[in-house]
Curated annotation (Swiss-Prot):
It is found in: Nucleus, Nucleolus. The gene is NOP9. It comes from Vanderwaltozyma polyspora (strain ATCC 22028 / DSM 70294 / BCRC 21397 / CBS 2163 / NBRC 10782 / NRRL Y-8283 / UCD 57-17) (Kluyveromyces polysporus). SUPFAM superfamilies: ARM repeat. GO terms for biological process: endonucleolytic cleavage in 5'-ETS of tricistronic rRNA transcript (SSU-rRNA, 5.8S rRNA, LSU-rRNA); endonucleolytic cleavage in ITS1 to separate SSU-rRNA from 5.8S rRNA and LSU-rRNA from tricistronic rRNA transcript (SSU-rRNA, 5.8S rRNA, LSU-rRNA); endonucleolytic cleavage to generate mature 5'-end of SSU-rRNA from (SSU-rRNA, 5.8S rRNA, LSU-rRNA); ribosomal small subunit export from nucleus. The lineage of its organism: Eukaryota, Fungi, Dikarya, Ascomycota, Saccharomycotina. This is Nucleolar protein 9. It comes from the Eukaryota. InterPro entries: ARM-like, ARM-type_fold, NOP9, Pumilio_RNA-bd_rpt. Residues 13-35 have a biased composition (Basic and acidic residues). Belongs to the NOP9 family. One of its GO terms (cellular component) is preribosome, small subunit precursor.
Length: 677
């Protein structure tokens, strides 16, 4: 058969090409609404795209009152917990009937979050009940959605509490006579309210966050912090804003909660109904129209909907062994599909798509991941690794989750190019080192050679790993403006620490680079929020030879008092207690320097900790006990060390013993000279 070319080939390629539409967020069905699971709800469907989010405004006096309360709670200067609890009770009384106005106000929504974090169980149920009938509306609101997320996390904690301490009463009441059901029933009632709107929530800018949190709660997964940088729930802007307004999570965050069995059934029902809406009630994968598959794939690369789809794929195995959502996105047969190939190529070239693929690889069945790898990526793994903002992250995911045979093949292909890959993606070095360690240090020598070639090349006259890896000359080191260490500095420091722990060559190289710095520059590293960890990482007593230890201590001991009183330097001072083992002169020199500045050291929070860790009270009051402590430390660190014998011991032995002793002394002397060299 003739090879297709020209217009026919171009037309076929354009047909198979995956190009997401610009209007993914709307995702309107082009089929009759009668096919949807929730039939006859046309009015609700129309409302779901534009829910009511205005519930009136507070008058000036009310606004000023709630503003003042918010600032009072933010300062948290209460004399007792009872006083704080009383204020929360009073605010909730004032807020009766105004809850919807408060949560949709920029300032007052912060107040409601603080109240929810501080209120007791009955008050929490009261707030939850006040939102009945408006949960969808509030989830779509810029400010109210954050309040809902806090409410859901606290509700999950109360759910577990009621589950572990059951009562015979299904209803409780507060002091005002207000009757509440169990938290489980209240939660299920809220979920029924949201069910008709699930599809629109998936791609809504704010409601998608609430939906993700609900899925995490229903599946008993970790509920992430709302402020930590690695939180999977909030957006980057949201986490920064939350830090600026200083709303701290309570103990209910960053935990996994037990949930009732009804939640698993509810999760299954919700996601099954959502699947039917996306597939228009198709009975099997083969019955789903190509248009529906394409539209769902568009959601996978949408910056709002993609995290929701990722989460659904991660947890669908709880209730669905067939993994319907995975099969909706990808095929499962062993043959290439042109449209799927175009979609995978788009994922590997798009920042959102590559993040999607990286995350679903971590939770998918291994046979599904292997299929994608062997069909579409195996033969071009190096090219993908060079896509530093997209495909590189997918390759790193393969290194973590593939079988040993495939990981070895990837390492064989990538390691020769490692020094080039590190130019744009330092994380690749971390992934390769971790993969090599898991495989019993597979190709470790080649990895080390490539890393040295990159950061400490032999042909360079001014080679310094601190400069090539940490970029010291352009860093915040030595700045007097109290600049925070940058994220890039933190990432580079962690990588260098990993290199130091990976191989002794990097430990030696790093120490040599530190000693080649001007002393002032080296000491500045000890006071830096990030680089101090690098200094700390090289202070490994058993791995560093005695000469290098002496050279390091000559510099570090010069400013030991100021270092001990510093938040970062004090950790290095603590580490020197062990690092000076068998170097008693240095240990005593540091101890005496700290004792000479007793007042300064003891007036510092960090200095007091160093004083304690160095047992300096013992040094001052019972010097012999302190020296005994040193001997115990040395014996613990070097249990096989030969104890020195008195010089006249050899004269007490017979001739043969003298000969053996002489040979032994010669041998140990020879070894010592070799060590010095």
């Amino acid at each position: 058969m003739a090879k297709p070319r020209g217009r026919k080939l171009l037309k076929k390629q354009q047909k198979d090409q995956f190009e997401p539409s610009n209007d993914v967020e709307k995702f309107e069905d082009d089929r009759d609404h009668q096919e949807n699971v929730y039939q006859g709800d046309a009015a609700d469907s129309e409302k779901s795209s534009d829910p009511q989010m205005f519930f009136g405004v507070l008058d000036r006096e009310e606004l000023e009152y709630f503003k003042q309360i918010e600032s009072t709670l933010a300062m948290d200067t209460f004399e007792s917990s009872e006083e704080k609890s009383q204020m929360v009770t009073n605010v909730l009384q004032e807020a009766k009937g105004k809850e919807l106005k408060l949560v949709t106000s920029q300032i007052c929504s912060k107040l409601m979050e603080r109240i929810i974090l501080e209120c007791d169980d009955m008050q929490l149920k009261s707030v939850f009940k006040a939102f009945n009938g408006f949960f969808y509306n509030l989830s779509c609101h810029k400010y109210a959605s954050h309040v809902l997320e806090t409410l859901f996390v606290r509700s999950a904690a109360l759910l577990e509490k009621e589950l572990l301490t059951p009562t015979f009463d299904n209803e409780t009441s507060n002091e005002d006579g207000e009757v509440f059901g169990t938290m489980e029933n209240m939660f299920l009632f809220m979920l029924n309210e949201l069910k008709p709107h699930l599809k629109s929530m998936v791609s809504h800018q704010y409601a998608s966050h609430s939906l993700r949190l609900l899925i995490l709660i229903l599946s008993s997964k970790m509920l992430p912090s709302s402020t930590k940088n690695n939180s999977t729930l909030r957006s980057k802007k949201s986490k920064i804003a939350r830090k600026m307004i200083d709303i701290k999570d309570n103990d209910d965050f960053n935990k996994v909660y037990q949930t009732p069995e009804s939640f698993k059934l509810e999760l299954r029902e919700m996601l099954t109904s959502l699947y039917k809406q996306y597939t228009h009630n198709a009975d099997s994968r083969s019955d789903i129209s190509p248009t529906d598959i394409t539209k769902f794939r568009e959601l996978c690369v949408d910056k709002v909907a993609s995290p929701v789809i990722q989460l659904i794929i991660q947890i669908e195995g709880i209730f669905d062994r067939d993994r319907a959502y995975w099969r909706l996105v990808f095929n499962t047969n062993d043959e290439k599909d042109p449209k799927e190939e175009a979609f995978v190529e788009y994922l590997l070239s798009d920042s959102v798509g590559s993040h999607f693929l990286e995350n679903v690889i971590a939770s998918a069945r291994l046979k599904y991941v292997e299929r994608l790898y062997h069909l579409y990526m195996k033969d071009r793994i190096v090219k993908l690794a060079k896509r530093d903002t997209t495909g590189a992250f997918v390759v790193q995911a393969f290194l973590k989750h593939m079988k040993e045979k495939d990981v070895k093949q990837i390492l064989d292909d990538i390691i020769p190019e490692l020094s080039i890959l590190l130019n744009s993606n330092m994380d690749f070095g971390t992934s390769i080192i971790n993969a090599s360690n898991r495989l019993g240090c597979y190709l470790k020598d080649e990895v080390v050679n490539q890393l040295i070639k990159k950061y400490y090349p032999e042909e360079s006259e001014n080679k310094n790993i601190l400069e090539s890896c940490l970029l010291l000359s352009s860093s915040t080191l030595g700045n007097t403006r109290d600049d925070w260490p940058t994220a890039d500095e933190r990432r580079r420091s962690i990588f260098l620490e990993q290199l130091v722990n990976y191989d002794d060559q990097f430990l030696t190289i790093t120490i040599d680079s530190m000693l080649n710095l001007p002393e002032e520059r080296f000491l500045q590293m000890c006071y830096h929020g990030v680089f101090s960890h690098v200094v700390e990482s090289v202070l490994q007593t058993k791995r560093v030879d005695t000469i290098k230890r002496r050279l390091l201590l000559n510099v570090l001991s010069k400013d030991i008092v100021n270092m001990s009183c510093n938040a970062y330097g004090s950790h290095i001072a603590d580490k020197l207690w062990e690092f000076t083992a068998k170097l008693t002169v240095y240990k005593e020199r540091i101890a005496q320097a700290l004792v000479d500045e007793t007042e300064k050291v003891k007036n510092s929070t960090y200095g007091r900790q160093v004083w304690k860790n160095w047992s300096l009270e013992l040094y001052v009051r019972k010097r012999w006990d302190w020296k005994k402590l040193i001997k115990e430390q040395e014996h613990e660190l070097f249990p096989n060390a030969v104890k020195p014998q008195p010089k006249n011991q050899q004269f007490k032995n017979n001739g043969n013993d003298n000969k053996r002793s002489s040979d032994s002394n010669y041998s140990s002397s020879s070894n010592f000279k070799k060590q010095r060299r």
